Amino acid sequence: MPIVNRIAAFDADMKKWRRNIHQNPELGLDCYQTASFIEATLREFGISEIHTGIAQSGLVAIIDGKENGDTIGLRADIDALPMTETTNLEYASNNSGLMHACGHDGHTTMLLGAARYLSETRNFSGRVALIFQPAEENEGGGRIMVEEGVLDRFNIKNVYAIHNTPDVTLGKFYTMPGAIMAGADKFHIDVVGVGGHGAYPHETKDPIIPAIGIVHSLQTIVSRSRDPNDKLVVSVTQIHAGSTDNVTPENTYINGTVRTFDKVVQDMVIKRMEEIVAGHAQSFGVDCKLRYEKGYPPTINNPENVEMAALAAKDVSGVSMVDDNAGQEMGAEDFSYLLEKRPGAYLFLGIGEAAGLHNTNYDFNDDASVYGASFFARLVEISQPLGR
């Protein structure tokens, strides 16, 4: 069957929900207004078991099927970004300096649409746990939810999530078994020398020269220390030194990001960074300090769950519109914390022509909501059928 007819029937309502959320973006863990809207909407559907205050402003709602069985977890992120919207849409952000530039308003709407349908029909066994999670963008709300025991508390067996993708055909799903998204780490290097007058460099220990050497040497981690079969990104994204033209600064700061798909490569990167930083410190007689921060782990899909998700996606969009062996993405996602604890799958959904994610002109395509909601609904019915 294609898009669920009942879900298509309330497409106009989903559009209203999405635009309401879009107009009222919130940041990080402080998504209380968004959570209140979600809770009120769920209660309109007749869903009474709603647990709030998870990861501060997150919530989990439970829908019981017609028969006993397992609990499937469906997750949507609800937070926005600290950006100023430039779309000039009539439903543009009302909150200065905040906007839904990554489509979390759409993700939330898709899960609400599935919730409405599932609460009406309940043609499945077991239970559905609807997970509305704050702080995907920065503070790791997924990690906090796991630490607070959300998976054990609701006895969730499998977990699934969707992310929208602009400029991919509307309704096209793609995913893959194994690591689909990279782990994301940060590094900070402080090069400390001796400052002084720019006219007397011999009386200083210039931190800029060794910093330049460090930046160049970091690039060799990818080109000379990495197995060519392993994907790896080491990007220097910030260099800060000095404040005027006739003073040699005391400090130079280097910041950047590392993207990896497995721990062996990650450990190699850390070891090589430590060696490079120590070597330049000794060569130039300066003090170099490396601070490496491990961030979101890789997002690793379970093959069996990918197969199940692909069945549901093909049921909604057709076989030709589903790629279940897509390539890896170098972006990162805190749904990875849930996948470390439970088998599941993360999928991408094309939303058609649109500005890129994290762009001030981005807007989620409302036409995609019926695809995502139908996917979640059919996933529940296919994976937890009645009479199993």
Q: What are the language-model segments listed below?
A:
Residues 1-100, 109, 116-124:
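Acidic/His- and Gly-rich active-site-bordering loop/insert found
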Residues 21, 61, 74, 104, ...:
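Divalent metal-coordination and catalytic microenvironments
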Residues 26, 77-79, 135, 165, ...:
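Active-site beta-loop-alpha junctions enriched in small/polar residues
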Residues 31, 59-60, 81-83, 87-99, ...:
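Histidine/acidic-residue-rich, glycine-tolerant segments that coordinate divalent metal ions
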Residues 75, 187-189, 346-351:
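Non-cysteine beta-strand/loop elements that form the S-adenosyl-L-methionine
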Residues 212-388:
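Metal-dependent amide/peptide-bond hydrolase catalytic core
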